[in-house]
């Protein structure tokens, strides 16, 4: 009796292994590429809530500078975030909203229209104050998905310390003497003498509060970690009783003459170079008509779990390169920027692995044995994805949208 049971189990085991060696489909690269291209066509239209591409209109001779500025800022921000995630081995959140977000850029109002800078006599040595007028977006307060504060750190060759830890605070409206006057948001360690760079902070909660309560919009404060002492970021050492001034300089906030030596010609040249680097907010909003659809038919997506990936085997599951040229591959002329992008796709066989990391695949194979009508073999699917920013026209109106999960970065068997 025991021998029969053991034999039956071994037969079931062998059948299961044989079945699990099959993949979702035979590896036909041309077929995969054609399907991926058509999927991208539908994906873009779906995310924009369009049933068909916008009508072709003559492309504008010149795109307004402010539109290009928003597009460039959004694109650069996404690239920076992707680089940080890669360095920290992090992944894009799997609960990313499906539909495209509209992107709005709000520049910091100039202190002085002619210079957009604070004169040296107006300096606060330990902090800077930055304010934004977001009143135009109040009617869309409930549609806010993300808000980023971006400020360009300038090179300061005269800095007395090579690096500082700067902190961003939301300035609060004090109700009484015991109420807090600021709320911590984030901090960054910056190299004061190094080449300039953009700094980005997630300020979604603060901007959301401003949109709902206008009187609470008192701006942001860029401050030192410990102005009453000297903080050394390299070893987290604090030198007491030694006040430290803010040595980091910011475009659009600090006067050029305080960090630039030379004649007026040099100073004017530096100001011109930094003229497009005003501190600004990038707001990403889900339009109302997309928001309603999102609430009634919310898409649930699989979490990006760690899985076995066959990167170095030609026939097995791995990332395959695919560049999409909007005009050539999709026949579209209505997307102005970019002209195309590296969409990539996942393809290849998923051999069966008897390990603790692939229990999901094992269950699927056993289920397939019991229910052969079901398609339950492990498939090669995308694991890490990144968003894409596009600039397009509907008629003569330019629109900038962020499309989530458009660029495949890695694959897994599932």
From Swiss-Prot:
Pfam families: TGF_beta, TGFb_propeptide. InterPro entries: Cystine-knot_cytokine (IPR029034), TGF-b_C (IPR001839), TGF-b_propeptide (IPR001111), TGF-beta (IPR016319), TGF-beta-rel (IPR015615), TGFb2 (IPR003940), TGFb_CS (IPR017948). It comes from the Eukaryota. Glycans are attached at residues 72, 140, 241. GO terms for biological process: activation-induced cell death of T cells; ascending aorta morphogenesis; atrial septum morphogenesis; atrial septum primum morphogenesis; atrioventricular valve morphogenesis; axon guidance; blood vessel remodeling; cardiac epithelial to mesenchymal transition. Disulfide bonds join 309-318, 317-380, 346-411, 350-413. Belongs to the TGF-beta family. It is linked to A chromosomal aberration involving TGFB2 is found in a family with Peters anomaly. Translocation t(1;7)(q41;p21) with HDAC9. This is Transforming growth factor beta-2 proprotein. It comes from Homo sapiens (Human). The gene is TGFB2.
């Amino acid at each position: 009796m025991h021998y029969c049971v053991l034999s039956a189990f071994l037969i079931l085991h062998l059948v299961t292994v044989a079945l699990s060696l099959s993949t979702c489909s035979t590896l036909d690269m041309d077929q995969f590429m054609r399907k991926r291209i058509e999927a991208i066509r539908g994906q873009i239209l779906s995310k924009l809530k369009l049933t068909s591409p916008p009508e072709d209109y003559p492309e504008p001779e010149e795109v307004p500078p402010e539109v290009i500025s928003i597009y460039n800022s959004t694109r650069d921000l996404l690239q920076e975030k992707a680089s940080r995630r890669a360095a920290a081995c992090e992944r894009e959140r799997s609960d990313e909203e499906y539909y495209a977000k509209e992107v709005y850029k709000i520049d910091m109002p100039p202190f002085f229209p002619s210079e957009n800078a604070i004169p040296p006599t107006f300096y606060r040595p330990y902090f800077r104050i930055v304010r934004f007028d977001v009143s135009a977006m109040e009617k869309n307060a409930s549609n806010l998905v993300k808000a980023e504060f971006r400020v360009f750190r300038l090179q300061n060759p005269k800095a007395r310390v090579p690096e500082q830890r700067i902190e961003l605070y939301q300035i609060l409206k004090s109700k009484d003497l015991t109420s807090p006057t600021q709320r911590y948001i984030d901090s960054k360690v910056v190299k004061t003498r190094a080449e300039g760079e953009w700094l980005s902070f997630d300020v979604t909660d603060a901007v959301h509060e401003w949109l709902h309560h206008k009187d609470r919009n008192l701006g942001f404060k860029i401050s030192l970690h410990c102005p009453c002492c000297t903080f050394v970021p390299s070893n987290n050492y604090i030198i007491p009783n030694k006040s430290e001034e803010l040595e980091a300089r910011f475009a659009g906030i600090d006067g050029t003459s305080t960090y630039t030596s030379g004649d007026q010609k040099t100073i004017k040249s530096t100001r011109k170079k930094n003229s497009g680097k005003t501190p600004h907010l990038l707001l990403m909003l889900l339009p109302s008509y997309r928001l309603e659809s999102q609430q009634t038919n919310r898409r649930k997506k699989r979490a990006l779990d760690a899985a076995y990936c066959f990167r170095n085997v030609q026939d097995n599951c791995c990332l395959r390169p695919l560049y999409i040229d909007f005009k050539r591959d999709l026949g579209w002329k209505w997307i102005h920027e970019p002209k195309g992008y590296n969409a990539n796709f996942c393809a290849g066989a998923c051999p069966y692995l008897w390990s603790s990391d692939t229990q999901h695949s094992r269950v699927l194979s056993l289920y397939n044995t019991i229910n052969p009508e079901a398609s339950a073999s492990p498939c090669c699917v995308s694991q890490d994805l990144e968003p894409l920013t596009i600039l397009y026209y509907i008629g003569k109106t330019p629109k900038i949208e962020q499309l989530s999960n458009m660029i495949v970065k890695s694959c897994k068997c599932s």
